[in-house]
């Protein structure tokens, strides 16, 4: 079936214009005004914004952890993503200790193949350094996995600074990109022990155990290692003024640094950890949600283009049966928030209120820049002829209120409960086929693995 999207406002990162889009054979076939195509089904987008499909470059689906497995697997997580207008995700395949990168990639393909409602790709998290890791990274790139993650925290995941430097050097040679979880792991361990020694065992101890400087110093260290390696760098889930300042300094020194933040760091403050009845546990994530001053600094950075992407770090757990495992010890609360469904809604609401952003800025943050940075562009994140027919017809006059009871995410809460969003996706196309109609996700799992190019 061919589709002709008529009379919409076409939004790209560069601007917006009124026009039509013809989608044929799964691709964008023509752009213009007054387009006609015999046999094409017309989708009237009058009064609507038409975005390229949104891309979430930071998700954790079907991930094993101390609390068992994350609440969302690929079927539930990708259906939830589509409901919000996200047509492609990048999930983190993670190397096991003693395992190879190929074994991790094979495992993630098994998790996702035939079980994804939207398209997907993988980053590869390197957690166990061996001298042949550079060769393994090259093999990943040949298979379309062209980005790698390193952790500076978590004893079971982190590499040494020397090993991080070697990963960065290998990535620079390959034209790959390294992204990093930037928290000082030793400082976190000491902070957790300190809070426990003081008898602070509730959710409020979580942010106290990893204050702002823990992120700021780790960002600075990672970027210094990237500079020594001659590598571009990507900082995930930026949450603090200190981390932002470290990025600014590196950029002033001539480095290429990409910055990502998440909706929770743009909308919530650390007051959530003081909620009664253990409700604060719902918001335990790492890095933690920060102060109003940090929130304001990140909003200004997003408006100024200093932050390139807004992803979710979707790592969902149920409050009952998972989060409450840490009721007597905050360090046992599974770290992570759900957000894969509501990122576009929250960001659109924010753009119309407390953090004014143009539709073009939203497009850049949610679609175009993620695609360009991670080797998906122009197949994804684009309204160009030849791009995949991934489209979001966004109705700015279709308000919704976010409620956990209505969500497709497989969790029993949302951190954005009660948020009033002035607009929402009406129709979502994935590779030229309608997958969301009038806000309802259609059945089926047509999502495909999308190999990515090196830089």
Positions of the model-derived regions?
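Metal-associated gating/positioning segment near the N- to mid-region
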Residues: 45-115, 132
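Histidine/acidic residue-rich metal-binding segments in metalloenzymes
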Residues: 135-310, 326
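His/Asp/Glu-enriched, well-ordered alpha-helical/loop segment
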Residues: 204-230, 280-282, 304, 308-310, ...
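Histidine-rich, glycine-flanked metal-binding segment
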Residues: 1-53
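Short, surface-exposed connector motifs at secondary-structure boundaries
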Residues: 86-90, 116-121, 145-147, 225-233, ...
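C-terminal cap of metal-dependent C-N hydrolases
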Residues: 8, 324-329, 385-451
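Alpha-helix-loop-beta-strand connector modules within alpha/beta enzyme cores
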Residues: 102-118, 167-180
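Divalent metal-coordination and catalytic microenvironments
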Residues: 8, 21, 26, 47, ...
